[in-house]
Amino acid sequence: MYLCPSFIKKLIMDVPFIYGRLAERESFIDRVEDRKELKNFLRHGINVILVSPRRWGKSSLVRTSMEELMQEDQQTKVCFLDASKIHTEEEFYNKFASTVIQGVSSTLEQKLSDLVKFINRFTPSITIASDPMNSIKVNLKVNPIKESPENILQLPERIAEAKGIKIIVCIDEFQQLANLPTWKNLEAMLRAEWQLQHHTTYCLYGSKTHMMKDIFNKASSPFFKFGQLMNLKRIAKEYWIPYIVNNFEHTGKSISESQAECLCERVKYNSWYVQQYSFFLWSHTEKKVTQALLDQQLQLVLDTNEDLFLTEIDELTPTQIGMLKAIASGEKHFNAKDIVEKYGLGQPQSITRNKKVLVEKDLVEKHIQDFSFVDPVFELWLKREYNILPIGIENRTKSVVNETMSNYKK
């Protein structure tokens, strides 16, 4: 069965809640001040390091802000690179070059011309995709031992100077590069080359908060004080509630403000989960949301994400799982004898090590006096899975929400 692109586009537009892809236009919520700040820094040549847990909307924020900036300033070009699937230094150079050429040149002819003009020290193989954007992929066959990869890192600056433009390079999941075997050398080279560029600015962002902070906050790191650090906050309920209520109304359905607030609080205003939970609730509501539907669809959210959570649990030791259960139960004194015995936390050195491991895995976040879960739905799922609250799931929803929200209300 063939579905024409216009029908598919209309079908997507008719769905009021979007997750799993970048939020655009009507689907993009608030972030007014964040957009303003991000554009202001990058417009004036200040590098930005954007940090927040996964699924908070960093990629959508950057994409929306940069599209606005390019409309406001025709002399600014933006290049977007996703580092999440880069596994070698050579792959990084190839993607970096492709991204820059793709971002600064609007036509296929310009792309090919720029390749010949600016990448003359290498012999690239070129793949041209048959799509409306005239996508280009470049394979430079760079050998970091024999070649000078600095030339690739200087590419956006050379193009910016030659064309009389400003270039902003946005690299998503930047911390993935720290997993490369050659990271230490690459890290030093990136900083050395990028800090000398005056027409190119960098926006580096990622969801592994612990790794991002290690790269940019440690005084011994080459990237220490590389740019302005922005910690993305949750979108406030003042924006979420009318968004949810209005989207239900526009599709002939209804949800009360108190129900919309309850939905948001259950997933702690996490952008991905608010959209996912709202979509499930909207798609299962004929006319009016009921409390039963609200509870049932929360369970669907937990069930839908269960495979991911099971994978994360499978990678943990029994004492680390015990630590998660203790944190989920609100415990703070992990070395107390009764707590150690109750949750099977092991020896003192294991407790210390497991705290560090769980933080490094971005499963929990350390505060002054306690720990909290990074992923709110993972916490709810964990409580359900291990029956931490000894009451029926339908009846315990409010208790779970109240308990898990207590550490987040300010």
Positions of PLM-derived features:
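A short, basic N-terminal segment
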Residues: 1-53, 68-74, 391, 395, ...
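C-terminal leucine-rich, beta-strand-based interaction scaffolds used for sensing/assembly
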Residues: 2, 6-17, 161, 303, ...
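Conserved nucleotide-binding/hydrolysis micro-motifs of P-loop NTPases
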Residues: 45, 84-88, 176, 207-211, ...
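P-loop NTPase nucleotide-binding core
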Residues: 53-56, 60-168, 200
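Alpha-helical sensor/transducer elements of the RecA-like P-loop NTPase core
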Residues: 60, 198-249
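Alpha-helical DNA-recognition elements
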Residues: 68, 280, 357
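Sensor-1/coupling segment of RecA-like P-loop NTPase cores
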Residues: 161-163, 167-170, 176-182, 189-220
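Amphipathic alpha-helical "lid/sensor" segments that cap RecA-like P-loop NTPase cores
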Residues: 241, 245-307, 318, 368
